[in-house]
Amino acid sequence: MAVQTNDEIKGTEKEFLDLFNHLCYSRTAWQVWSDLMSAMACTIANVFETNPKRKADREKEYERCIKELGGDVEIPAKLFAIVTMALENNPDQDFLGKLYMQLNLGSHWHGQFFTPYDVCKMMSLITIGDTVRNKAEDRDYIAVSDTACGAGATLISAANTFKEQGINYQEKVLFVGQDIDRVVGQMCYCLLYTSPSPRDTR
């Protein structure tokens, strides 16, 4: 299968799924997705990591994931580039979360269902109004917390709403996300890094 060059990457769901499915020839979609998210998260985190042991541990995890993904970094790197391009084209979306649900990877045993991004955006628009704007002006920072963050749609939509309302979210807002599922937590981490929202990459 020919893999497109960076110049040809458009950042579409079809692009991502075509390449992703190529990795699923001998493994389940869940196994491939899990290793892909781990590899992406390790790549991002180690750019900023200063602790040698943690950096080495992530390198080992990255190498294991790439081996499971076929041993070639080309396709995982292209998939990461597609995600980045998709968010450059339209930062106001939950690119990975939408693909995750399209691939039926959600766990109904955990009650896992990703709220559509448009619903998250509507909630952000309702919540972030004059009161929040005034608090942001009066305080050192305000916090947005999601204790079941999934791929980060609530946090990303909040960041985009702050930006639209003229609030300097990079200096005035602390975004906190957590989830019981490590894989979706990594999805959130990757999207927050590649989206125009502030991040603490620890």
Model regions and ranges:
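Class I S-adenosyl-L-methionine
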Residues: 2-148, 152-165
